[in-house]
Amino acid sequence: MQSSTSTDQHVLHHMDPHRFTSQIPTATSSQLRRRNSTNQGLTDMINKSIARNTISGTGIPTGGINKNKRTRSTVAGGTNGTALALNDKSNSRNSVSRLSINQLGSLQQHLSNRDPRPLRDKNFQSAIQEEIYDYLKKNKFDIETNHPISIKFLKQPTQKGFIIIFKWLYLRLDPGYGFTKSIENEIYQILKNLRYPFLESINKSQISAVGGSNWHKFLGMLHWMVRTNIKLDMCLNKVDRSLINQNTQEITILSQPLKTLDEQDQRQERYELMVEKLLIDYFTESYKSFLKLEDNYEPSMQELKLGFEKFVHIINTDIANLQTQNDNLYEKYQEVMKISQKIKTTREKWKALKSDSNKYENYVNAMKQKSQEWPGKLEKMKSECELKEEEIKALQSNISELHKILRKKGISTEQFELQNQEREKLTRELDKINIQSDKLTSSIKSRKLEAEGIFKSLLDTLRQYDSSIQNLTRSRSQLGHNVNDSSLKINISENLLDRDFHEGISYEQLFPKGSGINESIKKSILKLNDEIQERIKTIEKDNITLEKDIKNLKHDINEKTQINEKLELELSEANSKFELSKQENERLLVAQRIEIEKMEKKINDSNLLMKTKISDAEELVTSTELKLEELKVDLNRKRYKLHQQVIHVIDITSKFKINIQSSLENSENELGNVIEELRNLEFETEHNVTN
């Protein structure tokens, strides 16, 4: 009894009363009336155990106090002692009655409420409602289901809305599941399959009407499903990231440059593995679509094409890397050669620097010797500065004397200032005149520069003309046509601008008589053109004869091509024979691969059997865990019943003890009366004898 009360008190001390205020069951008046007798017995039992184990009000154990010690010495004293004990019991009963009721309530709560979440608490409900609302809104629940969602709806739900939310959340966990029309019957089985840890708090009859007093249970169930969905999304994101990282790692490894032949072999194996992986993924995706009764295999084919494009890109990058490696090695070789040349030059520079360092050392030594002479020079300079300061003082005194002399003569400083102002005006006018003259000279220079530029451009065009004529004469001389280029040249003196032409240069001044463009050069160019046309006609006649020869050569080529075609037919027949032999070899390889695939299927089947056995074992473990929990619950119930039986026995024994004590007191009173009567009789007999 003492151990059970101590465990109950321990549990009560470790509970947070502010967290579970809404979960404490409040007893009704009928229940209090029904439990009145049991509560009285329980309080008596607790009071007696406290009186036995501790001193009242202190908590000191009474192991060292003699329990059999009595305070009464006479019958009257005995009645007073029992009355005091009864008064103490009645006083302590009121102080401990609330503790015993709270212990009963906590024990009943521990047995009945298996869900540790404070689902009845309004603050907790609002928190999980906000979390459910945020998850549904984030994942576009209202768009996918065409059903509005709000916090108010989660506080006052409908049966239809609950079913829509439940279906949406479960389909995110199991997208291939098909719901029937009577979903209320399926919800319980789905929760059982999901292993909802607080399934015992939900009945099948409550699922048909979730919006009543049991809504807090279903709200907690929806919150649990939201949490599982969040965890599943996190796991899937991790898997996707790992796959992406794996692919990127393979691509980065394959894009790295090669160093040894072993790395080349490893890369070849990775290429083969990549191709096998692409084909396996294509087969699995197409098989999944086949199981789903879908005839559209284009997405998987597109993925296969993209995969092969990436594979080709990787191979191209590998080729490019090899090319870059070769280029880099060649560049390194060139750099090494340059470095060797630099080493030679640096050696020569080192020798030169060594000689320079010797010169600098000599210079430093000379400067050290000169630095020893500088203190004397500085003293001389100080003495000279003192002399100059004395001269400045003398000049200042002279200036003051001159001012005095001018004042005596009547000449003021204002006259000097006026003359200085006139002087400044004259200097300004001179500056303006100089600026205008500079502008005129600059304009003349700019015009002269423009004329020089025009003349230079003319000379450049003449040079281009001369170079084109030289090229023409060379090309014509190569063709066997000699051209006199002296008659086609234009001669202009380059010292033409040195003369002073204030009114410009005329055409006659540029080109003297007999050497102008229209007079002599144009005629010679037309004559040369006529000669070229005559030569073209003769060349065309020669070309006609050459074309006839070419036709004869083409006829010979056609005959030889026919011979080549016959040889190619023979070669194609040989290739067809080779391909037939190759196909037979491939057929044998395919048969061997089929046998390998059969063995792999057997291995996969054995793996599946192992997985099913493992899952069955896990289910057995979970079922045994559930049975263990049920046994624990039954054990707690039996413990509670035994607790009540012990309380009942203690109540009966306490009543029996009280009755015995009252009967003993009555018998003691009767014995006292009898003894007094006997004493009176003895006294009377003695008195009679004496008389």
Curated annotation (Swiss-Prot):
User: MF terms per GO, please?
Assistant: identical protein binding
**What is the stated purpose of this protein?**
Acts as a component of the essential kinetochore-associated NDC80 complex, which is involved in chromosome segregation and spindle checkpoint activity.
Remaining remarks: Present with 1160 molecules/cell in log phase SD medium.
According to the entry, what is the taxonomic lineage of the organism?
Eukaryota, Fungi, Dikarya, Ascomycota, Saccharomycotina
- Biased composition of type Low complexity is found at 54-65
Quaternary structure, per UniProt, is: Component of the NDC80 complex, which consists of NDC80, NUF2, SPC24 and SPC25. The NDC80 complex is formed by two subcomplexes, NDC80-NUF2 and SPC24-SPC25, which are joined end-to-end through their coiled-coil domains. It has a rod-like structure with a length of 570 Angstroms and globular domains at either end. The NDC80-NUF2 globular domains are probably directed to microtubules, the SPC24-SPC25 globular domains to the centromere. NDC80 probably interacts with SMC1 and SMC2. Also interacts with KIN3. Interacts with DMC1.
Sorted alphabetically, the Gene Ontology BP terms of this entry are: attachment of mitotic spindle microtubules to kinetochore; cell division; chromosome segregation; mitotic sister chromatid biorientation; protein localization to kinetochore
Where's it found, cell-wise? Nucleus; Chromosome, Centromere, Kinetochore
Tell me the gene name.
NDC80
Q: What is this protein called?
A: Kinetochore protein NDC80
Q: Which residues form a coiled coil?
A: 376-446, 522-686
Entry GO terms, CC: condensed chromosome, centromeric region; kinetochore; Ndc80 complex; nucleus; outer kinetochore
Family listed: Belongs to the NDC80/HEC1 family.
Instruction: Tell me which domain of life the UniProt entry assigns to the organism this sequence originates from.
Output: Eukaryota
Entry-annotated residues carrying Phosphothreonine = T38, T248
Which keywords, in A-to-Z order, does the entry hold? Cell cycle, Cell division, Centromere, Chromosome, Coiled coil, Kinetochore, Mitosis, Nucleus, Phosphoprotein
Instruction: Output compositional bias ranges, type Basic and acidic residues.
Output: 10-19
Q: Where is the composition biased (Polar residues)?
A: 20-42
Which region ranges are annotated with the description Disordered? 1-95
In its UniProt entry, the species of origin is given as Saccharomyces cerevisiae (strain ATCC 204508 / S288c)
